[in-house]
């Protein structure tokens, strides 16, 4: 009869052998929050992936969508800018949208998609809205037709973000219409880097 030490050595030898039922392109799927994928043809990449090991988090789902349900009217229109606050969050998968500051905070380095749709009231004013990344404008949208009742400023973009980067909308000028939830701000992680 085999002793405990012999059984442990036999088990270790079996585990050290090749994975049963797997080919070199098919990853071994593990239960839980982490997946380790080994590449049988690693490169000489100096970034640390030369070993051919990739670790992916199982909680990579990141998405948010927020709406404004009330009008957003600055008290002074001349050269006054402000963050657009969204008072109702519809989706916040990953809890990376700070509803108090209406700011998205990137949980990891990756490519993110953002879009916004902002409606101006009929007041013969132009609105300008910018998507800001860490305080700098990335894209803007304008609505300024003087002869329409309501007009929308919309835009969308893919952005590479680092962990901790912040994205938010800034009203450069004008008034927003939000009484029927017309103004929206949404984003999601396309893929991590």
UniProtKB/Swiss-Prot annotation:
Tissue expression: Localized in the Purkinje cells. Cerebellin is expressed in adrenal gland /adrenal cortex (at protein level). In the cerebellum, [des-Ser1]-cerebellin is more abundant than cerebellin. At lower levels also found in heart, kidney stomach and gastrointestinal tract.
UniProt-listed Pfam families: C1q
InterPro entries: C1q_dom, Cerebellin_Synaptic_Org, Tumour_necrosis_fac-like_dom
Secretion signal, residue range per the UniProt entry: 1-21
Keywords linked to the UniProt accession: Cell membrane, Disulfide bond, Glycoprotein, Membrane, Postsynaptic cell membrane, Secreted, Sialic acid, Signal, Synapse
Subunit structure: Homohexamer; disulfide-linked homotrimers. The trimers are assembled via the globular C1q domains. The trimers associate via N-terminal cysteine residues to form disulfide-linked hexamers. May form oligomers with CBLN2, CBLN3 and CBLN4 prior to secretion. Once secreted, does not interact with other CBLN family members. Interacts with GRID1. Interacts with NRXN1 and NRXN2 long (alpha) and short (beta) isoforms produced by alternative promoter usage. Competes with NLGN1 for NRXN1-binding. Weakly interacts with NRXN3 short isoform and not at all with NRXN3 long isoform.
Official protein name in the record: Cerebellin-1
